[in-house]
Amino acid sequence: MKATEVIEKLKAKFPGQPEYIQAVSQVLGTIEEEYNKHPEFEKANLIERLCVPDRILQFRVSWVDDNGNVQTNLGYRVQHNNAIGPYKGGLRFHKSVNASILKFLAFEQTFKNSLTTLPMGGAKGGSDFDPHGKSDMEVMRFCQAFMNELYRLIGPDEDVPAGDIGVGGREVGYMFGQYKKLTHQFQGILTGKGLEFGGSLIRPEATGYGNVYFLEDMLKTRGESLEGKTVLVSGSGNVAQYTIEKLLQLGAKPVTCSDSNGYIYDPDGIDAEKLAFIMELKNVKRGRIKEYAEKYGVKYVENARPWGEKADIATPCATQDEINEAEAKTLIANGVFAVSEGANMPTEPAAIKVFQDAKILYCPGKASNAGGVATSGLEMSQNSERLSWTREEVDTKLHNIMDEIHANCVKYGTEPDGYINYVKGANVAGFMKVAKAMMAQGIY
């Protein structure tokens, strides 16, 4: 396989889908060497089969707003690959949703799910419906109308959606209720459910906890630990909050937190009491992080990100493309030797190159934030067993999964000079499991 030739063919076949082409390009560039060690893959034209989704489903969603007007949105489900398990991936409700974005996300989800070591294929779906500014009743009516179409395409052994941007516990609950009404069946057809009807303990904490477990494993490769390390954390939502919580439990000192207006720097560290304030501020009061600075008398920098502060470790947990090339150089100059992504794709490609050229520890979110989808998989297991595991059981299983993801990244990402390229390791590890399953199942 020549990655460039495959990409050119896909560009011609799927014009006007830049997000999808970019995602495929990034993965193919890192797996090309390993792929070419297996001539049987090329004979089966495996890479083209893997790059094209099994199916893309598009449907109309009509619903009535509070003024009695009929609204129409587009709904999608991209079922990318089910070689290792039922299709699994979130539903996104956002005005930017289109086929290209969902194809890109489903492609990425296939490898991310493979990395978790759990039997889950890859999918993604959603709608161009925007829940912001809508009443609860409007959101409920839309979710019910959306499920009126989606229910035909999903099932516990076929396709199990979850939440994503614009789809939280409220939306999952509305869709689950409608599925139950339509089918007269109580099944684990969605994850991210409430604890009262089949949800899992640790699910809210999972992405943040898993991020720190992976970070801990990375540090061990250099004889280091989290004890006493100063950590820069961006964001102040779910992932950032539970990243900070687990950092504290393992002896680290998180010193920053941010939102879209700016960041706070607390040289004494964000302790358990201060974290409780952040959780109350963000989850209940919906306030701004500036209020933390006002309460505790620490530095607040408006319209900036925390990457200019001195620290040992950085973990971006806010949003896409939040570390650029210049910020990456600043982080290294200020003593940062490890970066673990809590958010999805928060580091720009040029910044990743800076980290790798400097030989610091860097892991992409595909591996380090896989704890969320891993715990969704554990929710599926509990639903199948008709059991609910304890908090300790789920946390132990999550920790073991993150350890195994790290081991696979090391296996496939270790360079001849001993440096661990976690980007390559994550992509190759995820790819190889899916590729071997596809080969075993024949041409279909």
Swiss-Prot record:
Enzyme class: oxidoreductase
InterPro entries linked: Aminoacid_DH-like_N_sf, Glu/Leu/Phe/Val/Trp_DH, Glu/Leu/Phe/Val/Trp_DH_C, Glu/Leu/Phe/Val/Trp_DH_dimer, Glu/Leu/Phe/Val_DH_AS, Glu_DH, Glu_Leu_Phe_Val_DH, NAD(P)-bd_dom_sf
N-terminal signal peptide: none
Keyword terms, alphabetized: NAD, NADP, Oxidoreductase
Binding, NADP(+): 207, 238
Residues at the active site: 124
Cystine crosslinks: none
Pfam families tied to this protein: ELFV_dehydrog, ELFV_dehydrog_N
Designated name of the protein: NAD(P)-specific glutamate dehydrogenase
Name of the gene encoding the protein in the UniProt record: gdhA
